[in-house]
Amino acid sequence: MENRSKQTYHTHLYQFVKDILVECPQCAKQAIVHTGVFDALKKIEYNVRVVCAACGYNKTLEKISPRQDPKQKRGNVLVMGVPRDPFFYLPVWLQADFSGETLWAYNLEHLDFLAQHVGAKLRERNTSPRMNRSIGARLPRWMTAADKREAVLKAIEKLRGK
């Protein structure tokens, strides 16, 4: 693990919204939400599917809820930043309790990113203006605190083996 992190303030959560590991609503085992090539800035294609290899459950996304508040711009609503997938709102598979908080990730790539950011002793922001919407800027203090670094990394490794 590197002691230095430069790219974590240029990465956004929507970049990990692909092949999300979730809990199957039918058998409670691991299922996967296939999102295809997802780009949060483009029109959503309706080829998103959830598939469970254990029980055969599968469902294709029919429609994404339109925004209800008239003050919001027109478009579709995807809830991100919570331990649920943004399409079917199923609980993510990679989640665990950590000191009263929830440590979670959409997939193994997201988990690797969290391990890299948390494990870095130096997190550089000076390569460009602050990116307040990036994951590095949005992670909670309990996760990035130096005194909890080893415990968080241990919890991440435990999730990796799930």
Positions of predicted regions on the chain:
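N-terminal cysteine/histidine-rich coordination modules
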Residues: 1-74
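Residue-identity detector for glycine
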Residues: 27, 36, 52-56, 75, ...
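Non-transmembrane, interaction-prone segments in cytosolic or luminal domains
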Residues: 56, 87, 111, 147-151
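Amphipathic alpha-helical interaction surfaces
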Residues: 58-61, 120, 124, 149
